[in-house]
């Protein structure tokens, strides 16, 4: 929302009359004021679904081939996406064994001890870990991977390697077979697993932003406010973009267990309504088709290639 804030401030200071409305859209779900952000529900749905499938695969080897799998999930400073992995805990799956979010300092010794205790009870272990885990002294766990460091235009360090560090540490300490899986960009582009609630709310947020601009409102962001979670009722409001830009909303600490290795039932109640419903993609040749942005006669057009 920083761009909307800057555009609005520039227009106001220079007596320009364009209208600037913000529409939240981040799978990170880390914007303040709004209950949640469009995009998050679909990403959470993908993460929980994939986690269920990974756990089923890991369990299929049984005691004959014990192994540990660490799933690295996006989340620089906020654990909303990683926490969504617990939705896989259902009648057909026990969910991840450990869940580590960046809001709580990561302790490698406690982590190793927790895994060793789990290994006394089971031979198949799956762990969800945020890419942005930091130790108590503020150091990124992923830095121990010694990967090439890329800095983006905003000065953000590309985070990758946390999962490998956690998996390799257990392999070294126990001799067990370990594996690291990074969802990376898959968690934000898997439209075949989009949440119906999420898609509807994204559309509504855009529609309301346009309505507000037509009413001469500007410098605001559409917010989603959940009035009821059971049954689910979401309302749309607007808030001053200055209350939102450059402010990060993290997971409430009381939604994370005291030892920092799992999340609470309160979080499950929060996220569950956001992943409800599905969409049927358009298929051709057995594969889902996607809309592409292409140029025709110098203009961008939306094209579905069949």
Which residues are covered by each model-predicted region?
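Flexible loop/turn segments at secondary-structure boundaries
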Residues: 1-3, 29-30, 77-79, 135-137, ...
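C-terminal non-catalytic interaction/assembly regions of soluble proteins
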Residues: 143-306
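Glycine-rich, charge-decorated loop segments at or immediately adjacent to ligand/cofactor-binding or catalytic sites
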Residues: 28-36
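Short glycine-enriched, charge-decorated loop/helix-capping segments at active-site entrances
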Residues: 35-38, 195-196
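Mobile beta-alpha loop/short-helix "lid" or hinge segments that flank ligand
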Residues: 22-26, 185
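Accessory alpha-helical/coil subdomains and C-terminal extensions
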Residues: 1-11, 17-21, 37-179
């Amino acid at each position: 929302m920083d761009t909307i804030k800057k555009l609005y401030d520039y227009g106001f200071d220079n007596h320009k009359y364009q209208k600037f409305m913000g529409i939240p859209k981040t799978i990170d779900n880390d914007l303040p004021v709004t209950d949640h952000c469009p995009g998050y529900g679909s990403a959470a749905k993908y993460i929980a679904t994939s986690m269920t499938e990974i756990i089923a695969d890991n369990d299929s080897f049984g005691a004959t081939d014990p192994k540990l799998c660490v799933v690295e999930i996006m989340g620089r400073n906020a654990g909303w996406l990683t926490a969504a992995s617990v939705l896989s805990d259902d009648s057909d799956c026990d969910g991840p064994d450990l869940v580590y979010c960046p809001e709580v300092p990561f302790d490698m010794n406690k982590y190793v001890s927790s895994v060793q205790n789990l290994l006394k009870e089971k031979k198949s272990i799956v762990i969800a870990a945020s890419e942005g885990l930091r130790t108590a002294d503020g150091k990124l766990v992923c830095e121990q991977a010694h990967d090439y460091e890329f800095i983006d235009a905003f000065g953000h360090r590309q985070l990758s390697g946390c999962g490998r560090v956690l998996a390799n540490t257990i392999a070294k300490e126990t001799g067990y077979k370990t594996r690291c899986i990074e969802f990376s960009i898959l968690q934000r582009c898997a439209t075949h697993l989009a949440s119906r609630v999420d898609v509807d709310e994204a559309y509504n947020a855009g529609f309301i932003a346009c309505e507000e601009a037509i009413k001469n409102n500007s410098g605001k962001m559409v917010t989603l406010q959940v009035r009821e979670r059971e049954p689910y009722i979401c309302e749309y409001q607007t808030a001053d973009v200055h209350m939102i830009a450059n402010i990060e909303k993290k997971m409430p600490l009381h939604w994370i267990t005291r030892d920092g290795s799992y999340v609470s039932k309160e979080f499950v109640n929060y996220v569950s309504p956001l992943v409800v419903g599905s969409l049927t993609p358009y298929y051709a040749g057995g594969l889902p088709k996607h809309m592409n942005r292409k140029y025709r006669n110098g203009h961008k057009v939306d094209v579905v290639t069949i």
